[in-house]
């Protein structure tokens, strides 16, 4: 089953190390409205567990995670 959603904003965090991808994701989501989807791109392997923990802690929905080589792409839906 394919996941279907549209991206409202993109955030490029390539080259940034923990905790910057999470902090920049939080800042971007703070400016978005409920229901919008953020695409965050990171090259930090630590961002995979960090984003899962961030989603669980904040309640924002982690819709999908893609790995393309050394790049991680996260789709996060603002829920509140």
Task: Tell me the role of every PLM-derived stretch.
Residues 2-3, 30, 64-66:
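Short secondary-structure boundary/capping segments
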Residues 10, 17-19, 49-50, 72:
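Helix-centric, low-specificity signal for extended rod-like, repetitive segments
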Residues 19-61:
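Amphipathic, hydrophobic secondary-structure cores in small proteins
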Residues 1-8, 79-80:
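Compositionally biased, disordered extreme N-termini, encompassing classical targeting presequences
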Residues 7-14, 41:
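Short amphipathic
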Residues 52-80:
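C-terminal structural segments of small proteins and small subunits
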């Amino acid at each position: 089953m394919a996941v279907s959603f549209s991206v409202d904003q993109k955030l490029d965090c390539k080259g940034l190390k923990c905790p910057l991808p999470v902090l920049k994701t939080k800042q971007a989501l703070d400016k978005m409205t409920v229901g919008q989807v953020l695409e965050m791109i990171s090259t930090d392997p630590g961002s995979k567990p960090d984003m899962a923990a961030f989603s669980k802690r904040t309640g924002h929905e982690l819709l999908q995670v893609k790995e393309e080589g050394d790049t991680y792409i996260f789709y996060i839906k603002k829920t509140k």
